[in-house]
Swiss-Prot record:
PROSITE patterns: ARSC (PS51353). The lineage of its organism: Bacteria, Bacillati, Bacillota, Bacilli, Lactobacillales. GO terms for biological process: negative regulation of DNA-templated transcription. SUPFAM superfamilies: Thioredoxin-like. This is Global transcriptional regulator Spx 1.
Amino acid sequence: MIDLYLSPSCTSCRKARAWLQSHKVPFVEHNILTQPMTTNDLRHILTKTENGTEDIISTRSKVFQKLAVDVDNLTINELLDLVTEFPNLLRRPIITDSKHLQIGFNEDEIRAFLPREYRRAEMLSTID
């Protein structure tokens, strides 16, 4: 099952939700502002990142700039607590399943969440 972590006002989040719905991909939606991610959720996501916290923290966010925190000097537990308290620190949307992780919306990369049969059929239809 796909988990879509988003905030409703985020344009990229709305695009990701619309894309998943239009391709009839089942997913569970999590509003990170009303239901902040647990530290276990965050740890699970971090295990799938290539660059660790750098991939999930939005350094351009107003919250990040206002807090003026040097995330490189925080322990992982301190960082997880901070993100739990301030979910707007996260880049959004976060889309994950048992194998894949996508942070942000990219129409080409999100195709990884389509079932293989769907992608194969779609590819064959473009050849005909």
